[in-house]
Amino acid sequence: EISLGLVGSEMCIRDRACMPNTNPTIDNAETVHYILEKAKEAKTRVYPVGSITKGLGGSEMCDFEELHKAGCVAVSDDGRPVKNARIMAEAMVKAHYAGMKVISHCEDLDIVNGGIMNYGEVSKELGVKGIHRLSEDIITEREITLAADLEVPIHIAHVSTAQSMQNIRTAARFGTMVTCETAPHYFMLTDELLRSRDADYRMNPPLRTAADVQAITEGVIDGTIDCIITDHAPHAPEEKADFEKAPNGVVGLETSLAATLTALYHTCLLYTSDAAAE
């Protein structure tokens, strides 16, 4: 955490959200206090994000009032979806009244079913199991529906598909309290890069198609996407050696600002003030 804070300061990243997929999980006040104490040694401000469910297990909800009082700014089962819609609905309401927002990782694991990259022409040619875009779109639409019906906010993490982008845009225009984010790789890179079977291009959600990249880019430009995040998830080279068995995730902290400027500012799609705001 401290080393990441130092790197972040060098990359002009002043604030960081510490997601709850830590050991131990950020599901109690004691862990939040520990993180904030350690953060004092770093040169950046750290904002803890608590977990929605204890141990990220998806079943027993955390005490949101306790987490918020300890210093959490939001809750999320980072990297995992809350499969049970009833639990998610209850979490969205309780988080709202506790003064926090739910950040949803939108992924239907039954559809993912062991897939390792975007389902499409490239996955078929490589002969590997693909992840259908419906895995993201279905849960995104569920969260939007819950937010609209319950009249509480929801934040959609790392949007990667054109359909999810359009659903969020439409919902926001009709007054649903939905915000969202994306990462540079989703408006810069496509699944074509996986033809080389390079696991460095494996991430979750997976790289999609050129049409999705275009849709995400348009979402950034028209303001549907509220912020660009790093989605920093580095792994050692040896972990990425086997294409089919490698974990998902890429370095983002050191590259996100430069990547955003390259893709959006130097192509005249955004002005510097817009890029800074993102």
Predicted regions and their residues:
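Conserved small/polar residues in nucleotide/adenosyl-binding loops
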Residues: E1-I2, L6-I13, Y271-A277
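Divalent-metal coordination cores built from histidine and acidic residues
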Residues: R14-I111, G115
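Histidine/acidic-residue-rich catalytic or RNA/ligand-binding cores of hydrolases
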Residues: N28, D110-S123, S164-A171, Y186-D198, ...
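Divalent metal-coordination and catalytic microenvironments
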Residues: V46, V75, H105, I154, ...
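Glycine-enriched alpha-helix->loop->beta-strand junction motifs that scaffold or abut catalytic
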Residues: K69-V73, H96-G99, R173-M177, A199-D200, ...
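Active-site glycine- and acidic-residue-rich loops that bind
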Residues: G79-M92, H155-R169, P206-Q214
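His/Asp/Glu-enriched, well-ordered alpha-helical/loop segment
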Residues: E125-P153, D200, I221, C227-I228, ...
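Hard-cation-handling environments
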Residues: S160, R169-F174, V178-L189, G219-I221
